[in-house]
Amino acid sequence: MKILDWSQLDGAARTDALTRPVQTVATQTRDAVAALIADVRARGDAALREITARFDGVSLESFAVSEADFAAAEAAVAPELRQAMQDAVARIDAFHRAGMSEGYAVETAPGVVCEKIVRPIGRVGLYVPAGSAPLPSTALMLGVPARLAGCREVVLCTPPRKDGSVDPAVLVAAQLTGVRRVFKLGGAQAIAAMAYGTESVPSCDKLFGPGNSYVTEAKQQVAQSGAAAIDMPAGPSEVLVIADAGAQPAFVAADLLSQAEHGPDSQVLLLSDSDGLIDAVQVQLEVQLAQLSRADIARQALAQSRMIKVQALDEAFAISNRYAPEHLILALREPRAWLAQVEAAGSVFLGDYTPEALGDYCSGTNHVLPTSGAARAYSGVSVASFQNMVSVQAASKAGIDGIGQCALILARAEGLDAHANAVALRMGVAA
């Protein structure tokens, strides 16, 4: 990792230091995804079969996961893994349940009541990738809040393996969250199928889940077309660590590597006011890299990552808020005392014994988070992501008589005569 001294950088160099790996979508990718989507819309399941054979190397007659498939998955998953997933589900459920909104009502004027009621989104589509490795934890992170929200139907797509099966752990994770409608579909074609529907796959109102550049582009295209809403902008995984001189170098290095191993386009940043800590973390990175099975991937990510020396921790928080990381680790002696300075981050991890990996799997928070600076305006997935908040209002005759004049004045100011007339008729006055 390159080491920079923030105080020695001019404005342009500071911007460059916080620039994420270039995430431009090639015209070729955009066009390829558009063609896949158009093919699925036009030919449905027939297109899905051809695309799946081409990209996944397997011919499927049926995309739906059967009861026999679920049973086989249960038998294939080790008891300790199943128990770990059950434990994770319990904590994810507890955290997300605590944050659920029940709506509210308020009388804004005599005879005028305004309410907010909560309704589940009817049908949602979950995408669980299985590129370099299957991600059953993502099935848990999406399935639990969907269940708590009360969505009428939950559809899950995950890529098939060469033998036509689906990763057993993903299926068990789906079952543990109550998801039983699972399809052996991956990539942009899965997104198209869930957005527009085919003979086998129902169309969904909103799509959730991470994926590669093709999946991300497909989500953006179906959202732009109005076919389905999506959870949030997606991008490569990232972590920013703010560490003081008392931090454990081995812990900090391990946290940086846990994100770097996601992919060569991941980015990790370390901000510290201690030269000694930065130097020690550099040493630990090399020690721990030698033990990783995905060391080559991690090295590629580290090559475009930074360690930044700051003069004071206040400066580190200003930099972090500017960057708006997906994951923010505060490896500080009094981490909670600094929490008030955090303005933009997807998820925050306090202290030496809260690695980001806990949030990825089993602390209870959600690991589907905004990336690429989107944390300035977006939040991670929650139960509310699977719900609609519907406004309701009711006015009595006395209520409209009391506030109607306000509406009349505003309607006239905007030149909307029909608006004014709709109120005036009920009040029995001239518009």
From Swiss-Prot:
Annotated protein name in UniProt: Histidinol dehydrogenase
Species: Xanthomonas euvesicatoria pv. vesicatoria (strain 85-10) (Xanthomonas campestris pv. vesicatoria)
Pathway involvement of the protein, from the record: Amino-acid biosynthesis; L-histidine biosynthesis; L-histidine from 5-phospho-alpha-D-ribose 1-diphosphate: step 9/9
Alphabetized GO MF terms: histidinol dehydrogenase activity; NAD binding; zinc ion binding
Residues annotated as binding substrate: S237, Q259, H262, H327, D360, E414, H419
Binding site for NAD(+): Y127, Q189, N212
Cofactor or coenzyme needed: Zn(2+)
Keyword field: Amino-acid biosynthesis, Histidine biosynthesis, Metal-binding, NAD, Oxidoreductase, Zinc
Active-site feature positions: E326 (proton acceptor), H327 (proton acceptor)
Pfam families: Histidinol_dh
